[in-house]
A protein has these predicted regions:
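Core dinuclear metal-dependent hydrolase active-site scaffold
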Residues: 1-58, 145-149
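Cap/insert and terminal regions of metallo-dependent hydrolase folds
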Residues: 49-145
């Protein structure tokens, strides 16, 4: 069992779970590290709560890739439903990316990906998401996508 904020070694990967904002009992998102590369997988979650942001601000990691939840397309679910919104959209992804950069967690060339799309918001068609993502420096994920970092 992985506990929030604790590093666990899993088959050569260093995995740190962080509490997610989601409607399930103990949701988590992950920081995954291997061979000098670091990924922050923060999808299937809403915007991180203050304790998670505080931890991120002090963790000293440098992300090669960040995968963002974009369930709500071009909508900001925090504006719509409040801070307990269990998913994000592109507007909230931009806010989180700016915060991660402010914390110094980005390297030159960090890859930003949006994923976990659904019908729950405006402009959620893949063509819309791809265009909007590109306009803001994100890559829209697709089935079978691979990324070299």
């Amino acid at each position: 069992v992985i506990e929030p904020y604790e590093l666990l070694e899993v088959n050569g990967y260093a995995v740190t779970a962080l509490p997610a904002t989601h409607g399930t009992r103990h949701p988590v998102v992950y920081i995954i590290e291997k061979d000098g590369k670091t990924i922050f997988s923060c999808h299937d979650s809403g915007y991180p709560k203050p304790p998670v942001l505080e931890w991120l601000g002090k963790c000293g990691k440098k992300f090669d890739l960040v995968s963002y939840d974009c369930t709500h397309g071009d909508m900001d679910p925090v504006e719509q439903w409040g801070e307990n919104a269990s998913h994000m959209g592109l507007k909230r992804n931009i806010i989180l990316r700016d915060k991660l950069r402010e914390f110094g967690l980005y390297k030159p060339g960090t890859v930003d990906i949006v994923t976990h799309f659904s019908h729950n918001g405006p402009k959620v068609g893949y063509d819309d998401i791809t265009r909007l993502a590109k306009e803001h420096g994100f890559i829209a994920a697709y089935d079978g996508m691979t990324v070299e970092i």
